[in-house]
Amino acid sequence: MLRVGIGYDVHALVAGRPLILAGIDIPHEKGLLGHSDADVLTHTLMDALLGALALGDLGKHFPDTDERYRGISSMKLLEQVMKLLEERGYAIGNIDCIIAAQRPKLAPYIPQMRENLARALKTDLENVSVKATTTERLGFEGREEGISSQAIVCLVKV
């Protein structure tokens, strides 16, 4: 049996915060605002995984009102989501993610993002796609007010 999920997330860019994507601290003058480390890519992926399992969304499992999650690494939260997936007898078929950001250029970091996500998802690198794009200076991403991300996942029963 196959299950498919889609995820979407947005975080504002602000001064004084790190820019973390797939667990990588990317040098930039601004970072993402959020209760946790605000890793928009990993949040999107977790939302897609939870959706594929019909388990609700990220906020249901890790509410921003819970102090246990303040500043937490989203990669640690992804480990918890993977436990839910494994408990239900599913594994990753493949994932496809896209990040929309005007700056910084993310292409140099994509190989490490893929490796980090593949390791956390307990899957082969060939099952993990991460892409980055600009919005040609259009919208909030283009004005460098925030970064958005989308992901789709295919889960397989094992």
Swiss-Prot record:
Residue numbers marked as site, Transition state stabilizer: 35, 134
GO molecular function: 2-C-methyl-D-erythritol 2,4-cyclodiphosphate synthase activity; metal ion binding
The organism's taxonomic lineage, starting at the top: Bacteria, Bacillati, Bacillota, Clostridia, Eubacteriales
Listed name of the protein: 2-C-methyl-D-erythritol 2,4-cyclodiphosphate synthase
Subunit structure: Homotrimer.
Free-text comment on the cofactor: Binds 1 divalent metal cation per subunit.
Alphabetic keyword roster: Isoprene biosynthesis, Lyase, Metal-binding
Name of the gene this protein is made from: ispF
PANTHER family xref list: 2-C-METHYL-D-ERYTHRITOL 2,4-CYCLODIPHOSPHATE SYNTHASE, CHLOROPLASTIC
CDD domains: MECDP_synthase
Keyword Zinc-finger listed: no
Swiss-Prot/TrEMBL cofactor(s): a divalent metal cation
Purpose: Involved in the biosynthesis of isopentenyl diphosphate (IPP) and dimethylallyl diphosphate (DMAPP), two major building blocks of isoprenoid compounds. Catalyzes the conversion of 4-diphosphocytidyl-2-C-methyl-D-erythritol 2-phosphate (CDP-ME2P) to 2-C-methyl-D-erythritol 2,4-cyclodiphosphate (ME-CPP) with a corresponding release of cytidine 5-monophosphate (CMP).
Binding site for 4-CDP-2-C-methyl-D-erythritol 2-phosphate: 9-11, 35-36, 57-59, 62-66, 133-136, 140, 143
Pfam family, one: YgbB
Catalysed transformations (reactions): 4-CDP-2-C-methyl-D-erythritol 2-phosphate = 2-C-methyl-D-erythritol 2,4-cyclic diphosphate + CMP
EC number: 4.6.1.12
Similarity comment: family membership: Belongs to the IspF family.
Pathway named in the protein's UniProt entry: Isoprenoid biosynthesis; isopentenyl diphosphate biosynthesis via DXP pathway; isopentenyl diphosphate from 1-deoxy-D-xylulose 5-phosphate: step 4/6
Protein's GO biological process: isopentenyl diphosphate biosynthetic process, methylerythritol 4-phosphate pathway; terpenoid biosynthetic process
Binding site for a divalent metal cation: 9, 11, 43
